[in-house]
Curated annotation (Swiss-Prot):
<feature type="disulfide bond">
    <location>
        <begin position="231"/>
        <end position="237"/>
    </location>
</feature>
<feature type="disulfide bond">
    <location>
        <begin position="47"/>
        <end position="77"/>
    </location>
</feature>
<feature type="disulfide bond">
    <location>
        <begin position="575"/>
        <end position="603"/>
    </location>
</feature>
<feature type="disulfide bond">
    <location>
        <begin position="141"/>
        <end position="147"/>
    </location>
</feature>
<feature type="glycosylation site" description="N-linked (GlcNAc...) asparagine">
    <location>
        <position position="66"/>
    </location>
</feature>
<dbReference type="InterPro" id="IPR001254">
    <property type="entry name" value="Trypsin_dom"/>
</dbReference>
<dbReference type="GO" id="GO:0005576">
    <property type="term" value="C:extracellular region"/>
</dbReference>
<dbReference type="InterPro" id="IPR043504">
    <property type="entry name" value="Peptidase_S1_PA_chymotrypsin"/>
</dbReference>
<keyword id="KW-0094">Blood coagulation</keyword>
<feature type="disulfide bond">
    <location>
        <begin position="518"/>
        <end position="585"/>
    </location>
</feature>
<feature type="domain" description="Apple 4">
    <location>
        <begin position="294"/>
        <end position="377"/>
    </location>
</feature>
<dbReference type="InterPro" id="IPR001314">
    <property type="entry name" value="Peptidase_S1A"/>
</dbReference>
<keyword id="KW-0645">Protease</keyword>
<keyword id="KW-1015">Disulfide bond</keyword>
<feature type="disulfide bond">
    <location>
        <begin position="21"/>
        <end position="104"/>
    </location>
</feature>
<comment type="similarity">
    <text>Belongs to the peptidase S1 family. Plasma kallikrein subfamily.</text>
</comment>
<feature type="glycosylation site" description="N-linked (GlcNAc...) asparagine">
    <location>
        <position position="454"/>
    </location>
</feature>
Length: 636
């Protein structure tokens, strides 16, 4: 099995551009050629983020400060494209290379929380103030409309005049114009993209209205909503004006003008027929239409022009969009319905691209439909949050890939054995129950297995993850059973496959959804005095109110940090060995990690529901603890 997986991986890496999510970072490797852009970034992870959001970038190489004697190339981030999906590899000490995350679903986020000690990220300094910490400086940057990144001089900075000074910065690209090593300073980026800004946002769309002010770019778009998304992800755009296809000036039709101003606000709008204006949504606190970096709408009787990447014949415009999404270089497409372009039920699907990711021209009134690739959608090709559904008593055997976030936590002492379950929530993070680590806090005794169905298939050749750090919730107490939650940081990022993916976290900001399709999974006992099961078990189970649950546990306190599930008559429940595993529920075609298997009286007893840690109550804690990870920050 492991040999087959490795073979598939190398075929994917070297032979095609239509593979799934590749998260590996290659140390001491530099990709030669294919350059489409270059900038300065503080680390390889931020370079990867820049590659992910660049319309042409598939690969990148990063040169840390100690990897080159050329001062102009230190902290250099080189974004690359390739027709074949790969580039020649050159051995270079210290260099780090990797792939765009365009195909990585839930990992696509512009949020980057890390604060870097000992480097000065240079740009245009436009504001200076005294603060007490780098975190406070980052907060000021996040709440300043123009600030993109910052540098904070600590209380031990060599110049007394600048100690505890917070410098807010910006640049045309949104990245530093240079990065220098400097003692006693800390630098980082605005957290606007993390939903942390207090500025607020305006979702108004102003019909027949144009903003003047300063144009920073002009990009072709089919409507004002695509224009708004483009503005949201442009480093300098604060608001926009879009001219429709009926605009009086031919050269400006379907052009999205991205704008800024010194004040941060537009001047008074000018009444203009066939002009539509609005604001960037970067400072919004919640996920709204336009804040996701993709466009799913299909435009009938519209043709998008651009560089021809590939032509194929498919059935239906949805099939054309799916084909475009699967081919990672494809940015947009046109599906022709002209009789001469059809062969039976299949018609011509033209896959296209451009330098900026937008059509070079748009034609209306044609027998065609057009749209964009969904490669940057959070529910994109990796299907992390939309996977078919995917201590279990009364359960049945699961199938391969049905619950790809489920992991087995195993302890290796005299013999190795399954102890708890857990859930993958990020490429370097697993969420489980705190009580799994009672008396077992040494990270080197644990092995974590993902992408497995049968425990008997684990051999000495089976790949596993090691633990870098165990983070138990600070309020967890063994004797009380509350706050039964722990994070595991893995030594190395996981490579997501059809058998191994992450589950989405619930949003603490959303109105409480009514979950009607909930499941528990695990390898635990199928009866109270049973044994660990070989095949992963699953059981469909209803949620019950905390008030109802409290009636069943009069000697215990059911807190708001807990959630209960089970049948009144019993029969299905989690049991020994399922602890730490997931309680997942489907809502609006998305699977969420609603609970963590925690405790209960016996297993599947009548009127004794299972008690689970309520994950929504801990989202802030999870984000706080994962923000300094070297993987993409978790964001919901």
């Amino acid at each position: 099995m492991i040999a087959l997986r490795q073979a598939a991986y190398f075929i994917c890496l070297f032979a095609t551009v239509s593979c799934g999510c590749l998260t590996q970072l290659y140390h001491n490797i530099f990709f030669r050629g294919g350059d489409v852009s270059a900038m300065y970034t503080p680390d390889a992870q931020y370079c990867q983020l820049m590659c992910t959001f660049h319309p042409r970038c598939l690969l990148f190489s990063f040169l840390p400060e100690n990897s080159t004697s050329d001062a102009d190339k230190r902290f250099g981030c080189f974004l690359k494209d390739s027709v074949t999906g790969t580039l020649p590899r050159v051995s270079r000490t210290g260099a780090i290379s990797g792939h765009s995350l365009k195909r990585c679903g839930h990992q696509i986020s512009a949020c980057h929380r890390s604060i870097y000690k000992g480097i000065d990220m240079r740009g245009v300094n436009f504001n200076a103030s005294k603060v007490r910490s780098a975190k406070e400086c980052q907060e000021r940057c996040t709440n300043n409309i123009h600030c993109q990144f910052f540098t904070y001089a600590t209380k031990t900075f060599f110049s007394a005049e600048y100690r505890n000074t917070c410098l807010l910065k910006r640049s045309p690209q949104g990245t530093p114009t240079r990065i220098k090593v400097l003692s006693d300073v800390e630098s980082g980026f605005s957290l606007k993209a993390c939903g942390n800004s207090k500025i607020g946002c305006r979702v108004d769309i102003f019909q027949h209205s144009a903003f003047s002010d300063v144009d920073v770019a002009g990009i072709i778009a089919p409507d004002a909503f695509v224009c708004r998304t483009i503005c949201t992800y442009h480093p300098s755009c604060l608001f926009f004006t879009f001219y429709t296809n009926a605009w009086k000036t031919d050269s400006q039709r379907n052009v999205c003008f991205l704008k800024t101003s010194q004040s941060g606000s537009p001047s008074s709008p000018t009444p203009q027929e066939n002009a539509i204006s609005g604001y960037s949504l970067l400072t919004c606190k919640q996920t709204l239409p336009g804040t996701e970096p993709c466009h799913s709408k299909i435009y009938p009787q519209v043709a998008f022009e651009g560089e021809e990447l590939h032509v194929t014949f498919v059935k239906g415009v949805d099939g054309c969009q799916e084909t475009c999404t699967k081919m990672i270089r494809c940015q947009f497409f046109t599906y022709s319905l002209f009789p001469e372009d059809c062969r039976g039920e299949k018609c011509k699907c033209s896959l296209r691209l451009s330098l900026d990711g937008s059509p070079t021209n748009i034609t209306y009134g044609t027998q065609a439909s057009s749209g964009y690739s969904l490669r940057l959608c959070k529910r994109g090709d990796s299907r992390v949050c939309t996977t078919k559904r995917t201590r279990i008593v009364g359960g049945t055997n699961a199938s391969w890939g049905e619950w790809p976030w489920q992991v087995s936590l195993q302890v290796k002492q005299r013999a190795q054995s399954h102890l708890c379950g857990g859930s993958i929530i990020g490429r370097q993070w697993v969420l489980t129950a705190a009580h799994c680590f009672d008396g077992l806090l040494l990270s080197n005794i644990w092995r974590i297995y993902g992408g497995i169905l049968n425990l008997s298939e684990i051999t000495t050749e089976t790949s596993f993850s090691q633990i870098k750090e165990i983070i138990v919730h600070p309020n967890y107490k063994i004797s009380e059973g509350s706050h039964d939650i722990a994070l595991i940081k893995l030594e190395a990022p996981l490579n997501f496959t059809d058998l191994q993916k992450a589950i989405c976290l619930p949003s603490k900001d959303d109105t409480k959804p009514v979950y009607t399709d909930c499941w528990i999974t695990g390898w635990g006992f199928t009866e109270e005095k049973g044994k660990i099961q070989n095949t992963l078990q699953k059981a469909n189970i209803p949620l019950i109110s905390n008030e109802e649950c409290q009636k069943s546990y009069r000697d215990y306190k059911i807190t708001k940090q807990m959630i209960c599930a089970g049948y009144k008559e019993g029969g299905k429940d989690a049991c020994k060995g399922d602890s730490g595993g997931p309680l997942v529920c489907q809502h609006e075609e998305t699977w969420h990690l609603v609970g963590i298997t925690s405790w209960g009286e016996g297993c599947a007893r009548r009127e004794q529901p299972g008690v689970y840690t309520k994950v929504a109550e801990y989202v802030d804690w999870i984000l706080e603890k994962t923000q300094d990870s070297h993987g993409q920050p978790l964001r919901k």
